[in-house]
Amino acid sequence: MSEATLLSYTKKLLASPPQLSSTDLHDALLVILSLLQKCDTNSDESLSIYTKVSSFLTALRVTKLDHKAEYIAEAAKAVLRHSDLVDLPLPKKDELHPEDGPVILDIVGTGGDGQNTFNVSTSAAIVASGIQGLKICKHGGKASTSNSGAGDLIGTLGCDMFKVNSSTVPKLWPDNTFMFLLAPFFHHGMGHVSKIRKFLGIPTVFNVLGPLLHPVSHVNKRILGVYSKELAPEYAKAAALVYPGSETFIVWGHVGLDEVSPIGKTTVWHIDPTSSELKLKTFQLEPSMFGLEEHELSKCASYGPKENARILKEEVLSGKYHLGDNNPIYDYILMNTAVLYCLSQGHQNWKEGIIKAEESIHSGNALRSLEHFIDSVSSL
């Protein structure tokens, strides 16, 4: 794999119209990941590689092909070839859900919405893991555009994420209903591109790949958030290509949020893997459908990892609040948990989801689930 090969792909992007196929992108990214492994010095060779990689990624962004479904999917598959994936047997049916087998979920957003809201997807994952029959295996990273990413929050809560990797996940898997996998410990290829992404300072195809890189194949339902309406349908199709057996909600809050929004409407693109052909069903959500009041995003802001962890553990998971208190962060978490629950059950009884979320919190199950994971990691 050579710089000349990468240059040939760049020239395909510069043709009018662009001639780069989705398969070409897959192969080009394999070349890039291979080349960047060599860039550990300030040598002339490294400078040459950085220049050619930057040229390719910039040209790709200008063509907007990196926001097309087939291209996003092939890019994700290329990165996964440089990842440490987890090989797991499926849990026995009676371990989690005696009637239908385990429901294993993830909830994660692309980021990039610029809203800097509370760590709601991580919080909702923890609360949902306290609901009988659900197992949440959340995959995420640390903050890039906000002040507290999922990894920052989990680390501040006391989990030694350095111990959670492809070798230890199988040990943690049987006895935990909540798990968190920090992306950099599984995707070494993404580590190689981090310098070039910072150097470029513009969004690239790598900015949208995170939710499509889950290292555990047994996740069978997921909520993936996107930051723009235009990206959402393409992202839904990409998710169907990367996760063909997964039922998926792609969510976009109309205020520009990659979560189910606490104010205004949220559009959901629904991928049903049991359908004979890929037809995206869309529907809308708003807080009133959950029996909740609306809350301004400023009332659901992130305060940084330390304060977010305190609020989550000492206020939300401790049972300080109840439905009807109209606490913005509490309601925000309830709402996103309810959507996870309803996805797991295959229905849209959002108010039932709220009830299940509250039961998880006030029974202490959610907090126990979090603490059990932290203790399990510590004992590795």
UniProtKB/Swiss-Prot annotation:
Domain of life: Eukaryota
Gene name, Swiss-Prot/TrEMBL: TRP4
Keyword match Transferase: yes
Protein species of origin: Saccharomyces cerevisiae (strain ATCC 204508 / S288c) (Baker's yeast)
Binding residues annotated for Mg(2+), in chain numbering: D258, E259
Family to which the UniProt record says this protein belongs: Belongs to the anthranilate phosphoribosyltransferase family.
Lineage: Eukaryota, Fungi, Dikarya, Ascomycota, Saccharomycotina
PANTHER family cross-referenced by the UniProt entry: ANTHRANILATE PHOSPHORIBOSYLTRANSFERASE (PTHR43285:SF2)
Keyword set, alphabetical order: Amino-acid biosynthesis, Aromatic amino acid biosynthesis, Glycosyltransferase, Transferase, Tryptophan biosynthesis
Binding site for 5-phospho-alpha-D-ribose 1-diphosphate: G109, N119, S121, T122, K142, S144, S146
Cofactors (names): Mg(2+)
GO biological process terms on file: L-tryptophan biosynthetic process
Self-association and partners: Homodimer.
This protein's name: Anthranilate phosphoribosyltransferase
